[in-house]
């Protein structure tokens, strides 16, 4: 890596690892995109630090398996150690798995659908200060509206903005961050 300090939000071990290896790096793997979408949804009202600490509990979120879940499977998942104990969010994961598979079938892959919003090229905001980072933008509002029309839940524009960053469609590394140019 070049000189400079990493983005200041990355403070804990989990945050630093996520920042250095995933955040704002283009992802075109459907399974990873689904996992990230669910992590972002589960994060609503919680800290990203907590989600990253409990990420291992989400690692088996396979959309094809989740799409077939009923109430018994949801209850069993909620009883598992490390999982965020929120029925609404757990049920949402099942709903989103079904919607995710429908989009993947329509577009050939979920990645193809997602990346069409940016014509396959990450948006680089070239941020100079942390306070310049928006919580949402026009792109996240458009993607959010379309996902909702397709039956997804917990996909408001703020969650979608974070998702687009995490999936690498938006590069919001500060220009002074050594990871700014990675993946562009």
Predicted region positions:
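HhH-family (HhH-GPD) DNA N-glycosylase catalytic core used in base-excision repair
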Residues: 1-184
């Amino acid at each position: 890596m070049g000189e400079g300090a990493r983005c200041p939000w990355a403070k804990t071990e989990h945050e630093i690892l996520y920042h250095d290896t995933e955040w704002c790096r283009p992802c075109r793997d459907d399974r990873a995109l689904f996992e990230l979408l669910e992590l972002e949804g589960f994060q609503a009202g919680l800290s990203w630090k907590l989600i990253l600490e409990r990420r291992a509990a989400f690692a088996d979120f396979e959309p094809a398996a989740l799409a077939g879940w009923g109430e018994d499977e949801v209850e069993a998942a909620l009883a598992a150690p490390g999982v965020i104990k929120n029925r609404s969010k757990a049920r949402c994961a099942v709903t989103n798995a079904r919607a995710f598979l429908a989009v993947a079938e329509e577009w050939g892959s979920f990645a193809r659908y997602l990346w069409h919003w940016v014509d396959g090229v990450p948006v680089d905001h070239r941020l100079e200060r942390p306070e310049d980072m928006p919580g949402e933008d026009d792109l996240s509002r458009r993607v959010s509206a379309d996902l909702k029309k397709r039956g997804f839940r917990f996909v408001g524009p703020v969650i979608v903005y974070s998702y687009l960053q995490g999936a690498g469609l938006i590069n919001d590394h500060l220009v002074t961050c050594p990871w700014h140019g990675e993946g562009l």
